[in-house]
Amino acid sequence: MAARHHAFILAGTGSGCGKTTLTLGLLRLLQKRALRVQPFKVGPDYLDTGWHTAICGVASRNLDSFMLPPPVLNALFCEQMRQADIAVIEGVMGLYDGYGVDPNYCSTAAMAKQLGCPVILLVDGKAVSTSLAATVMGFQHFDPTLNLAGVIVNRVASDAHYQLLKNAIEHYCSLPVLGYVPPCDGVALPERHLGLITARESLVNQQSWHDFAATLEQTVDVDALLSLSVLSALPTGMWPERPDNTAGAGLTLALADDEAFNFYYPDNIDLLERAGVNIVRFSPLHDRALPDCKMIWLGGGYPELYAAELAANTVMLKHLRAAHQRGVAIYAECGGLMYLGSTLEDSGGEIHQMANIIPGHSKMGKRLTRFGYCEAQAMQPTLLAVPGEIVRGHEFHYSDFIPETPAVMACRKVRDGRVLQEWTGGWQTGNTFASYLHVHFAQRPEMLQHWLATARRIL
């Protein structure tokens, strides 16, 4: 197995079709076969990767073609494959759903072509028979250049039902049906307004997933799946120039990591560590002091669910304000922005005092605000960019931030060649920068260089 590279993308007909649940079961099942698995997720989602990591113990990585140029994304993929026998890549939304109407832009299908990976299509078998072959045929012929290698059927009532579906699909589509997923209520993933509950919040019942993997072992032809997943070659990639391991030497970064703040791309943390930065984790919820540091990173998460506890930890808020006043280079994304604001109004209308470093008020709403990919151009110097530089990222939040100071980034959402929305966002005060944008540092090496340079000036 080690002599060959194996990978496949598990795609679906749409969101909510069971991709994440099956991905988790297959990760556990392949590990039972003593294979070194490397999970990936197409797109920017943090929640699915968190579940991947919790189930198999290996940090799952995001493959996002909006934020990352193809050579960089390919290099990221190849780097993780060095220590893996097989990559299990969970797709995003439906197979051909991307950013806009072009099925070859930011879609699962586009990622499969870029990486040269076969696609396994997950389809819903509930209350259907031969008509399911028509569904599969539509996906098969929509893009004949795509390597659609096999099918797995979800929500199958019985083996007899499965045989009916399998025979229809294989007869009319000439595609192998690799197995099915029976109803398994014990592994249903909990959800709330932002999608799945994080694996960190949910007590992962490892025995349930062990049992689910045992079920899949009986209903999915894993040997056939492995045979189909052999790659002829790994994609060609190239990292941009990265900060060398002396750029961050002597710098310590305090990383907020608890129930309220835990949305981070592992690649970003890797890049910081490779630059020589010492990373120390702390909890804004539970700790009474900050680590001794010259950099602080407050990532995304769910501060609105823990607003009372965050507000009650006045000692931590005081230490954060003192760090800001000393010039510590503080970077905050989404939930981190809400925490650094003056106040946070939760969904019940209760207002909580926050750090008051970025003057402004966060208020929870009932609908997503500016959801999706966007570009942000610096209008003045910021922690991550100088004027004119463009940062690509994504926003996913139900809150809105009402600032008391002008924003420093010009943001816009462009889809299918049209500007859909323009706004300003991102706030810089002293050496602190916060915005709703989630970013991947590998898109622009300058982002880390700016942050490290700011931190080094205060040594």
Predicted regions and their residues:
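Internal gly/pro-rich beta-alpha loop/helix module
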Residues: 129-245
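Phosphate-binding active sites in nucleotide-utilizing proteins
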Residues: 249-325
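A short, charged/proline- and glycine-enriched loop
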Residues: 3-6, 246-252
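Cysteine-nucleophile active-site neighborhood
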Residues: 303-383
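Beta-strand->loop->alpha-helix junctions that form or flank phosphate-binding loops
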Residues: 41-42, 177-185, 278-285
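A short helix->loop->beta-strand "cap" motif at the edges of active sites that frequently abuts
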Residues: 117, 175, 325-329
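C-terminal and late-domain segments of enzyme folds
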Residues: 112, 246-249, 261-271, 278, ...
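ATP-dependent carboxylate-amine ligase catalytic core
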Residues: 2-115, 119, 123-150, 159-163
